[in-house]
């Protein structure tokens, strides 16, 4: 996410909402609701978080990063938004979560500093907000140790995802602010798989994240038509 791989409008969206990041009744409610699901999925697929060195790319206000630290990981969260990072730092301090740090730095720049330093790299709900997702994937591959795990999540690009993730989530159910997502930045699983292979990662698992607006319940299932998560591995011995 060097300056060439940052969309200032995307940064501004989340800067404006930063103060609400830890309010579970705000626009960030969906992130709080899905966090236990994605946290458990990452923990399980990575063979545990405790004692691992973890990087969270595009960490925002720290919801996932802090929850991984609470499970015993040594976490660095990075983002290009200053206001969300300030919120994340303050929340970790208030909650006395010591094994976590935050930095405002592009992931590509960090990859030049800390190649092969992390057991686990996560990049969740961010890929659809950057101009060049392939560059992010490559940087994550550089940062993880051989034998380490890299996790991504994003939104598929098809008529169903437009209906559900934009019309439904932003306009009908109002789960998210209008304009949160740009359909043209959504990423098909085939495109994601191609970029993963090109970066030198091995695709291990892909699962869909689903929502029932009547029960307000989220769950994981194989269908990846809308939201989905990806587990990859950097082959080799650490």
UniProtKB/Swiss-Prot annotation:
Enzyme class of the recorded protein, top EC level: transferase
UniProt entry tagged with the keyword S-adenosyl-L-methionine: yes
Domain of life: Bacteria
Pathway: Cofactor biosynthesis; ubiquinone biosynthesis
Keywords: Methyltransferase, S-adenosyl-L-methionine, Transferase, Ubiquinone biosynthesis
Lipid metabolism keyword on record: no
Reaction equation(s) it catalyzes: a 3-demethylubiquinol + S-adenosyl-L-methionine = a ubiquinol + S-adenosyl-L-homocysteine + H(+); a 3-(all-trans-polyprenyl)benzene-1,2-diol + S-adenosyl-L-methionine = a 2-methoxy-6-(all-trans-polyprenyl)phenol + S-adenosyl-L-homocysteine + H(+)
Residues reported to bind S-adenosyl-L-methionine: 38, 58, 79, 124
GO biological process, one term: methylation
Xref: InterPro entries: SAM-dependent_MTases_sf, UbiG_MeTrfase
E.C. number(s) listed in UniProt: 2.1.1.222, 2.1.1.64
Matches recorded under Gene3D superfamilies: Vaccinia Virus protein VP39
Molecular function, one GO term: 3-demethylubiquinol 3-O-methyltransferase activity
Family in the record: Belongs to the methyltransferase superfamily. UbiG/COQ3 family.
Function: O-methyltransferase that catalyzes the 2 O-methylation steps in the ubiquinone biosynthetic pathway.
Designated name of the protein: Ubiquinone biosynthesis O-methyltransferase
Organism: Acinetobacter baylyi (strain ATCC 33305 / BD413 / ADP1)
Encoding gene (name): ubiG
């Amino acid at each position: 996410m060097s300056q060439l791989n940052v969309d200032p409008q995307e940064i501004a969206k989340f800067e404006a909402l930063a103060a609400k990041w830890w309010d579970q009744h705000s626009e960030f409610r969906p992130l709080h609701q899905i966090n236990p699901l994605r946290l458990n999925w990452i923990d399980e697929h990575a063979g545990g978080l405790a004692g691992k060195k973890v990087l969270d790319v595009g960490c925002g206000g720290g919801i996932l990063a802090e929850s991984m630290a609470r499970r015993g990981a040594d976490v660095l969260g990075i983002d290009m938004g200053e206001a969300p990072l300030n919120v994340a730092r303050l929340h970790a301090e208030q909650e006395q979560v010591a094994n976590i740090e935050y930095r405002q730095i592009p992931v590509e720049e960090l990859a030049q500093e800390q190649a092969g330093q992390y057991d686990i790299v996560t990049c969740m709900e961010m890929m659809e907000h950057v101009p060049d997702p392939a560059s992010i994937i490559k940087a994550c591959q550089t940062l993880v140790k051989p034998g380490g795990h890299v996790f991504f999540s994003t939104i598929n690009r098809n008529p169903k995802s437009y209906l559900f993730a934009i019309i439904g989530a932003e306009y009908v159910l109002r789960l998210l602010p209008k304009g949160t997502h740009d359909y043209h930045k959504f990423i098909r699983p085939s495109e994601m798989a191609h970029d993963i292979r090109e970066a030198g990662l091995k695709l291990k698992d892909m699962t869909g994240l689903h929502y029932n607006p009547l029960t307000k319940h989220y769950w994981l299932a194989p269908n990846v038509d809308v939201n989905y998560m990806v587990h990859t591995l950097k082959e080799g011995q650490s």
